[in-house]
Regions:
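Flexible glycan-contacting loops in extracellular carbohydrate-active proteins
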Residues: 164-199, 203
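Secretory/extracellular carbohydrate-interaction modules
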Residues: 21-114
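C-terminal motif of bacterial Sec signal peptides marking the signal peptidase cleavage site
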Residues: 12-14
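Short, aromatic/His-centered strand-loop micro-motif at the edge of beta-sheets
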Residues: 114-140
Length: 215
C-alpha cells in the first residue's frame, strides 16, 4: 500500500514555474496543503544546496478568536529536504521548514518569521528552531547528512541535528528523493503562498562561522 501511495505521490503534476533568474516559484493554493506532487527526483549526494525566498505570503495567523486551534500557529510548514535511509519520508527524512509567530511563545516574539528543522525518524516527527529570517531575503542553505548528524548551513551559520544511524537496520528499498513545499501541520493554507527555490551545486566549503547543536 505504501508503495502504491508513493507512486501516486511522485507521478502527478506540480504547481511550480521557473523564471529566468533560475528560481522556481512553488505555489500552495488557498485551502491546500501541497504545492503539487512531483515526479521522483533522486538525491545523488549526501547533501543539497539551494537558495530560498519567502515573501509576505508566508505570514499567517491562526490565533484569532475565530480559530478553534490556535496552537496550530506553531506547526512547522515544509520548504525543502529529502527522504533518508531508503524509506518513505514519513518514516525517515530531514527538511527545512518555517513558522510565523503571531504571538510571543518562548524565545519567539510576535511578528517573527523563523526557519525551523523537521525530522522524521522511525515514523515519528520532531522539529525545532533554526534562525529568525526576513521576508523577501535570499538565504543560501545546505542540508547535509553525516553518519550520526544532519547539518544545516544557512548563510554563515551551522546547525546540527541528530541522525539515528540505527535506522540503517530498516529495509532500504528506494533511493532518497527530494521533498517539496507543503503547508501544515493540521491547517491548510489560509491564502495562496509562494516560495522561491533555486537549486545550486552542493557547497563543500563548510565555512559557517557559528555552529549550534540542536536535537
Amino acid at each position: 500500500m505504501k508503495r502504491i501511495l508513493l507512486i501516486l505521490f511522485l507521478t502527478l503534476f506540480s504547481c511550480e514555474k521557473e523564471f529566468d533568474d533560475g528560481f522556481r516559484v512553488f505555489t500552495i493554493d488557498k485551502g491546500k496543503h501541497r504545492s503539487g506532487t512531483y515526479s521522483q527526483h533522486k538525491i545523488n549526494d549526501n547533501a543539497i544546496t539551494f537558495q530560498v525566498v519567502l515573501d509576505e505570503s508566508a505570514i499567517y495567523d491562526f490565533s484569532t478568536p475565530f480559530s478553534p486551534t490556535p496552537q496550530d500557529q506553531h506547526d512547522i510548514n515544509k520548504i525543502y529536504g529529502f527522504s533518508d535511509f531508503g524509506q518513505l519520508h514519513q518514516e525517515s527524512s530531514i527538511r527545512l521548514g518555517w513558522s510565523y509567530f503571531s504571538y510571543d511563545k518562548g524565545p519567539h516574539k510576535a511578528g517573527e518569521l523563523w526557519f525551523r528543522w523537521l525530522r522524521h525518524a522511525w515514523g515519528q516527527h520532531r522539529g525545532g528552531p533554526l534562525m529568525k529570517i526576513e521576508p523577501n531575503e535570499i538565504y543560501t542553505v545546505t542540508i547535509r547528512k553525516w553518519i550520526t548528524q544532519y547539518e544545516f548551513i544557512i548563510n554563515d551559520s551551522i546547525f546540527i541535528v541528530d541522525r539515528d544511524i540505527e535506522q540503517n537496520r530498516m529495509l532500504d528499498w528506494m533511493d532518497s528523493y527530494y521533498l517539496y513545499p507543503y503547508f501544515g501541520g493540521q491547517q491548510k493554507a489560509p491564502h495562496d503562498i509562494t516560495i522561491k527555490i533555486k537549486d545550486l551545486p552542493v557547497d563543500r566549503t563548510n565555512r559557517g562561522k557559528k555552529r549550534e547543536k540542536l536535537h
